[in-house]
């Protein structure tokens, strides 16, 4: 598919007013030099609300491919249910987003952690409040395929360094807001190309795909980042490229936008398992057959 521009967004689900972990990288269709987009209004950091307003304000005459680093849905295919044995459990991804949003309406800035306080639903999460009795280390089909390169953390886990669940809760609220502005892949058909497309990304996968691993205490070096960018047909970042904090969120955003542009040219990266209509799919994970 052809796009006018690409955004790679390293995500954060934390409760703060501003999210230090949100970084936004951009490439246009003619450029091979990715750049970091600064937050609006001279703020030092983005927050989720300002980012969503920014995405809504983009030129409607252009088509963008936008990648968010969070799981777009929960496992479904293993038990044919997101929340096993829960009455009125949602049965589609869009109903799931609305469900998560509804149980967090009192929270500003798209924070999603209030669901841990809803008695029956909280039992499915490993959260900062408690480990629910129905919590399971479940995996989506796309995560099973990704495991050949590196394994994502379980989406119901919201505790510890591998906790992706908090980001997904906030992210699903965001998808519920943006679903009328953009096609969200792979849940929507992509016939309306004017709307642009939002996909799920996994920055670690894009590094590991080329056997690039961070050092234990220092993270990715500039040389490693540039080696990875070269694999995705992008120019290196300059020696003045800055990364702040141990998570190197800028590096994740930069490699993601390069990978997005690279993968978008190849039809095989738009193919998914049939279960992806319920669970979502990590963009860049190659699907081979339905035998899972």
Each language-model region and where it sits:
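RNase H-like (RuvC/DEDD) metal-dependent nuclease/polynucleotide-processing core
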Residues: 2-7, 11-292
């Amino acid at each position: 598919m052809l796009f006018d521009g690409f955004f790679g967004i390293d995500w954060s689900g934390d409760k703060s007013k501003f999210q230090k972990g949100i970084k936004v990288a951009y490439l246009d269709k003619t450029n091979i030099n990715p750049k970091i987009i600064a937050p609006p209004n001279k703020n030092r950091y983005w927050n989720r609300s300002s980012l969503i307003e920014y995405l809504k304000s983009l030129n409607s005459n252009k088509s963008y491919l936008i990648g968010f680093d969070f799981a777009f849905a929960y496992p479904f295919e293993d038990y044919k249910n997101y929340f096993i044995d829960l009455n009125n459990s949602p049965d589609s991804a869009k109903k799931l987003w609305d469900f998560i949003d509804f149980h967090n309406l009192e929270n500003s800035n798209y924070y999603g952690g209030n669901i841990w306080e809803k008695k029956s639903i909280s039992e499915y999460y490993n959260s900062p409040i408690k480990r629910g009795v129905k919590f399971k280390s479940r995996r989506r089909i796309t995560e099973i395929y990704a495991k050949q390169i590196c394994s994502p953390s379980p989406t119901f886990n919201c505790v510890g360094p591998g906790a992706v669940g908090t980001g997904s809760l906030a992210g699903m609220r965001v998808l519920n807001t943006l679903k009328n502005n953009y096609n969200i892949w792979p849940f929507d058909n992509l016939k309306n190309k004017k709307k642009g497309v939002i996909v799920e990304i996994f920055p670690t996968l894009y590094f590991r795909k080329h056997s690039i691993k961070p050092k234990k205490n220092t993270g990715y070096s500039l040389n490693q980042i540039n080696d990875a960018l070269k694999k995705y047909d992008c120019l290196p970042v300059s020696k003045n490229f800055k990364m702040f904090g141990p998570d190197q969120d800028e590096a994740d955003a930069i490699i993601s936008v390069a990978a997005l542009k690279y993968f978008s040219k190849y039809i095989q990266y738009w193919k998914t398992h049939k279960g992806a209509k319920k669970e979502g799919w990590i963009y860049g994970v190659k699907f081979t057959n339905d035998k899972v």
